[in-house]
Amino acid sequence: MKRLPAVAGSFYESDPKKLKMQIEWSFRHNIGPRDIPKQTYEKKKRDNLFFVVPHAGYIYSGPVAAHSYYYLVSEGRPDVVIILGPNHTGLGSYVSAWPKGEWETPLGSVKIDEEILMQLVKESEVIDLDEKSHLYEHSIEVQLPFLQYFFDDDFKIVPIVIMMQTLEIAEFLADAIYNVMQKNPDKDIVVLASSDMNHYDPHEITVKKDVEAIEKIQQLDYKGLYEVVEGKDVTLCGYGPIMVNLILAKKFGKKAYILKHATSGDTSGPKDSVVGYLAARFGS
């Protein structure tokens, strides 16, 4: 079973050469890390296990996303990347994993780690195997070219989209991922929470709203983040995936490090209506 790209040519370049140039542009951008990370091939224990990455078009959020990937790549190639994204389309189940096969982008194909996926399904009891949720969803797809640029097809993924972003679902998923990571100590597993921040307010208002959410992220306060999103009109689309990583970070004794916060007004133009973007890592 192969999942074909849904947003190549719109969110990112469909031509492989242009796409690689777009990724390099993201790293070298003045909002980005301004450098392309050097890969290490030495196998050592990874410090940064969990990340927040944005998922807009690369011209908007690519430079911010590059900050998270800089740290991920610098610690070597992971065996498995669990990618948690929100469900923007409304299709499919409340929590949906692509069941098997591979995902294709202009840079090639990446296989699903079916063994880790089935362990997660068994542990969580809330994950459905459902490809419908993923067919047109961009939040996971846009992460793959960044990973493929550095690791080619030498890693596997577990793509999970979350429509029901509740505290209970976040707790169930975090417990399941924690248990699976504990049962597979020889596998280098990384978890990405794919999310943009506040949407379509003027730049100053978006920054103010985002800062409230970022404070909760820094404190690993997933319940506080939920309250900010639900109670203060912060239109943060992937708070469910972020909550999962906040719970996991606390379980693993990690701290939150904010790598970059910016808006689409910073990266590509008008500031009257912007989207916020955050890159964060969770490590020692």
From Swiss-Prot:
One Pfam family recorded for the sequence: Memo
Top-level division of the source organism's lineage: Archaea
Disulfide pattern: none
Family affiliation: Belongs to the MEMO1 family.
Protein name: MEMO1 family protein LS215_2219
Phylogenetic lineage: Archaea, Thermoproteota, Thermoprotei, Sulfolobales, Sulfolobaceae
